[in-house]
Structures are given as C-alpha cells and as structure tokens.
Design a protein with these regions (language model features):
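Short, well-formed alpha-helical segments that are part of the catalytic scaffolds
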Residues: 15, 19-34
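A conserved acidic beta->alpha catalytic loop
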Residues: 30, 42-52, 70
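Glycine-rich, basic loop-to-helix element that forms the pyrophosphate-binding segment
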Residues: 67-85, 106
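Short aromatic/hydrophobic "clamp" motif used to bind/position activated sugar donors
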Residues: 90
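Conserved donor NDP-sugar-binding/catalytic core segment of glycosyltransferases
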Residues: 98-134
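Short, flexible, basic/aromatic active-site loop/helix in glycosyltransferases
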Residues: 139-180
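A short, conserved alpha-helix in the catalytic core of glycosyltransferases
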Residues: 172-232
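Active-site-adjacent helix/loop segment of glycosyltransferases
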Residues: 216-294
Length: 305
C-alpha cells in the first residue's frame, strides 16, 4: 500500500478551458481525486468539451463550471476562477494536463513547509515521459530570449554565463525541491496570501507570458518559487492552440513585448530595446511563414492524393 495516505488537499483547482475536447474530462477526473474543489472556467468553447464534462460528472458538488460567454484570454479566465475559489491554496492547471498520483499532495507539502514560498510547480512531462522545457526555468530576459531564439545557447558550454539557456530541462533533474526563477502557467500552485500581496493575473496578456509576469511580481514581493521534481504531471502541450497557430503566434509575440517593456525597459538602452522589438517581430514573421508553407504543402499533397 502507498505510504502516502490518500486525502483531498485544501486546494481549489482552476482550469481555464477553450476547446480542450475530451482531455478536459480526463483532467477533471484526475483533479477530483486529489483536490477539495475544481473550478472550470469555460472561455466560450465551441466544441463538446463542456457537454462531455457535465455528462461525465452529473451532480458532482465539488465541480463548479463557470461559463464566461466570451474568450477574454487565459489570464482573465484565471482571475475569474480565482474569484470563485474557496480554498487556501489555488492550483492553476491547464485542461491538457493530467495530475499523477500524489503529485498535488507533494506540491502542497512543499508549499506548507516554508511560509516564504508563494508558488510551487511540478515536474511537467510529455506523454512519452520526457521533461518539458517550461516547468523549471530562469526568467527569459531580453538577452536570454535573443540567445534562445537564434540558437546561441549552443555556445553555452564555452561561455555559460553569456549564452545561458533559460530552459532548465536539459540540466539533471534535482533530487529535492529547488528554488527557481519561474515555472509554467500550465501548473502553478499558489498561496492565497501571496496572491493578495503580488496581485492577480495581468489581464493585458491574452495568451502567453502572463505566467512569467506573475513570477516576476512574486519575486519582487520576495516570495519564493519552488520546483518539485517528484510531482509529475503529464502535459499534452498545445492541445487547445494547435488548430489556431497564427492566432497563438500573434499573442505569444505580443505578450513577449509587453513582458519586456514592463520589466526591462529601464534596464536596457532604448536602442537595444528597439532591436529586441524588431527581432521579436522578425521571429513572428518567420513563424507565420513556416506555418503558411506547411499549410500550403498539406493542401497540395491532399489534392494530389
């Protein structure tokens, strides 16, 4: 028998859904086994995800489904769920994530072990068991993002301080919880007191970089952010955004610029910030071009089969 006794954690799990399909039901099923309260905020989904969810859990009093009626973005959805949460800890969880057995309990244990810890993340893995890049990372400063975007992190072994890769999944997995600069918004366990101190999610971000913004603000208020290596969560990354690559790319790059201007404008010369802005939009243009070429190739291949 597992030495970790099964119990529901004093956690409200907030899941922001937009067309997550059958994965939403799987996500909620795993969440109900570990947390006191599940809040699903539906941002105007057009698929059957909510219908499947209500059919699977009729009369479940620990499940609260909130239909916003519009898609106001991930951060706004998180704040809607936060307003409805009743537990002392809140886990923001993507609908394409599956909590593994005892993962939430281990994250809560770390959060409760130090009153200075405001945010905890788990071990985000792909379906094949490999670690994803965003679960533990350094803050992507404009320079670090430039290094990452243009592949200069390959020079890290020669000049580690200059060409540092902010994704830490290439480093050995730690044997114990460690403090990090940032974790992924797909899996964030947060102390309510820390939220009251740092403030809610910034709703000016529609999609992407709002998690980094929150990590920065938590650190500015001296709250620790901790990565828990023995709390695995499977993340089917991109499930909700795969069908809208241009839309997602636009908001991702727009979010990057807001993040840089908000936190680094005073630290970098205006000329360098201008170059960073140019490089971000150049990267966006290349991303759009790649997607367009792929779509044209698929259409051409389909017509000739």
């Amino acid at each position: 028998m597992d030495t970790e006794a099964h119990s529901l954690q004093p956690v409200s799990i907030v899941i922001v859904n937009h067309n997550a399909g059958a994965l939403l039901t799987r996500c909620v099923h795993a969440a109900l086994e570990q947390a006191q309260e599940i809040i699903v905020v539906d941002n105007a989904s057009e698929d059957l995800s909510i219908a499947q969810l209500t059919h699977s859990f009729p009369g479940q009093n620990r499940l609260n489904i909130i239909a916003t009626g519009r898609n106001s973005g991930f951060a706004a959805g998180c704040n809607t769920g936060l307003s409805a949460a009743t537990q002392p800890y809140i886990l923001f969880l993507n609908p394409d994530c599956l909590l593994q057995e005892n993962s939430l309990q281990r994250m809560v244990r770390v959060l409760e072990s130090d009153a200075a810890t405001g945010m905890v993340g788990g071990y985000l893995v792909n379906p094949d068991g490999t670690e994803q890049g965003g679960g533990r990372r350094a803050i992507p400063t404009p320079w670090r993002a430039f290094v990452r975007a243009f592949g200069l992190y390959r020079l890290e072994k020669y000049w580690p301080r200059l060409f540092f890769d902010f994704h830490m999944n290439k480093q050995p997995l730690p044997q114990a919880p460690i403090e990090v600069e940032a974790i992924s918004g797909a899996l964030m366990l947060v102390r309510r007191q820390a939220i009251d101190d740092a403030g809610p999610w910034d709703e000016h971000y529609f999609l992407h970089c709002e998690d980094l913004d929150w990590c920065m603000r938590f650190q500015q208020k001296n709250w620790k952010i901790v990565f828990v290596p023995d709390a695995p969560v499977v993340h089917f990354q991109g499930t909700c955004s795969r069908s809208r690559p241009f839309f997602v790319a636009w908001h991702k790059h727009k979010g990057m610029l807001r993040f840089y201007r908000k936190f680094f404008r005073q630290e970098y010369p205006s000329v360098l910030m201008g170059l960073i802005t140019l490089s971000v939009w150049l990267r966006f243009s290349v991303t759009v071009l790649i997607h367009a070429v792929r779509n044209c190739y698929r259409m051409f291949k389909f017509r000739h089969e």
